[in-house]
C-alpha cells in the first residue's frame, strides 16, 4: 500500500473514534429518553469538544454531543435495550386493547405481565467489590433523602412509588447505622445536618436537609433527576442487603404498625421501641424453654440408664454418687444458659466478620487497627447511662440517630415512648428557649435534670468526650463556636474556610484553658495542705521572677526589632536612589534604540518595491488612526473623572 493511502486510512480510523449522539441513536434504535437512561445506568458521559484533537476537529461541530467508539460498544451489548423494546411493544398492545377494542380483561392481563428491567448486573459490573460501592454512597444517600421530602407530581416527573421507596431506604440505612454504632462525625450547617459513618473502613457522608416547604421550580428537569434516583435506589438496596447479611441482621427489617402511624421513621423498625415487644419476648422464651426441655429430657433418660448399671459401684463409693448427680445438674443448667444466649450470638460476631473481611482485602494487619477499635468502643459507650428527652421542635431524626449510636436512650412526647416525661431517670432535656414564648408548661426546677441545647450532642460526638453542660444551657444565648470536623478530610475541605477554622480553634482553646484554671483553683482551695501559706508565698515569688525575666526578654526583642527596622529603612532609601539612576539610564537607552530602529526601517523602505511601499504606508496609517482613537477615548475618561 502506498504511504498516502495508508495515512488516509489511519486518519479515517482516528476520526471514527468519536461518534455523534444522532449516529448512535440511529444504530441502536432508541429514543433520547431511553438513551439518557442507559447512559446514566452505565456511567457513560459525553465528551467535550476540546478533548478532540485539533487535527480531527474539522468534521465536528461545537454544538453537537460526542461519544467515543468504546462507549458505543459498551451500550450496544447491553441487555436492557431488549427490555426497552419489549416495553414499547406491550404499550402498543395495551393501547390497542383498551382504546380501540375496549377489551378490559385482556388489558389487565397485559398490565400484570408487563416487562420490568433490572439493574443488578450493571451494579456488579461497575462495583465488583462491596467496598467500591460503599465509596460511592455519598451522592446516592444525599439524593435519596432529598427526593423523599418532595411531593409527588406526575407532571414534573416525581413519581409517588419512588418517593415511598426513598423514604423506606432512608429509614433502613439510618436503622443499620445506629444499630451497629457506625456514626463518627456530625455538623450543623445552613444546608442541613451532615453525618459521617465508617462502613468497612470507608467514610460515608450524607446530608439530612432541614424541614422545609418544597417549591417545584419549572427550570429544573425532575425527569432527569428521577432517572438518577432509579439507579441510586438499586445501588442502595444492593449494598444494604450485603451489609445486613454481614452483621447477621434480617433484610428488609420488620416494621411496627403503631410506630409507623406516628411517623417515627427508623425507630419503627427497632424492636426495643415496638409496642408488641413484651409479647414477642414471651413467645421467644416459651420456644427456647421447650427446646431446652427436650434436650434435658433426652439427657436425663441417658443418665438414668447409666446410673442403673453403676448402682453397685455407687453403694460402695458414696462420694462418686454425689459427684455424678452434681454433674448432671450442671449440664442441665449449662444447656439452659446456652439457649438463653442464642439471641446475642449474632451481635458478638459482627465485629470479627468485618475485621476478617478487611484483613482479607488488604492481605495484612495495619498497626492503626487497635487505635480504631479503641475509638469505636469509646464512641459506642459515649452516652451510656444517659437518657435524653427530645421536644417536638427539635430535629428528632438526627438527634435520635446520634444518641442511639453512642449508647444513649431516648424519650419523647408520645404514649408509645418507653420513658415518659415524669420519669426521674431522665438526665437531660433537649430544647431551645425563645424570648417571647415559654417552651415548657412545667418549671425547670421541678425535675432534677439538665436543660441543654441540641448543639451539645454534636460537639460531644466530634470531640469524642462528654463536654461540660454549663456552656450549652438553654438560658445562654452565646454558645461556643461550632467547628466543622470535616476540615481534615480531603473531600470536604471546601465546607469551611481554613482561616475561620484556625481562628475559631484558637478561641476555643483559650476558653478551655480558662475553664481548666478555674477548676484547678477550686480543687486547690478544697485540698489545701497545712503549710499552704508558705507554699503560696514561694509560688508567688517564682511567678514574679519569671515575669521579670519575660519582661526583660521582651524589651530586648523590641530593641533588636527597632534596630533592624532602621537598617531596613536606610537600605530602602539607598535602593530608591539606585533605581532612579537606573530608570534614567534605561529611558535614554530606549530613545536611542527607537531612533536606530526608525533609521533601519527607512533604509529597508528604499530597497522595497513600489507595491510593498504602498502596503507598508497603509499599515502605518492604520496604526496611527488606532492610536488617535485610543488617545481621544482616554482624554474623555480623564475629563469625566476630573468633573
Curated annotation (Swiss-Prot):
Disulfide bonds: none annotated. InterPro entries: BRCT_dom, BRCT_dom_sf, PES. This is Pescadillo homolog. It comes from Plasmodium falciparum (isolate 3D7). Interacts with dual specificity protein phosphatase YVH1. Residues 305-329 are annotated as: Disordered. Required for maturation of ribosomal RNAs and formation of the large ribosomal subunit. Belongs to the pescadillo family. One of its GO terms (biological process) is maturation of 5.8S rRNA from tricistronic rRNA transcript (SSU-rRNA, 5.8S rRNA, LSU-rRNA). Residues 378-474 form the BRCT domain. Keywords: Coiled coil, Nucleus, Ribosome biogenesis, rRNA processing. GO terms for molecular function: ribonucleoprotein complex binding; RNA binding. Residues 305-323 have a biased composition (Basic and acidic residues). The keyword Electron transport does not apply. GO terms for cellular component: nucleoplasm; PeBoW complex; preribosome, large subunit precursor. Its main location: nucleus. The keyword Coiled coil applies. Residues 531-615 form a coiled coil. It is found in: Nucleus; Nucleus, Nucleolus; Nucleus, Nucleoplasm.
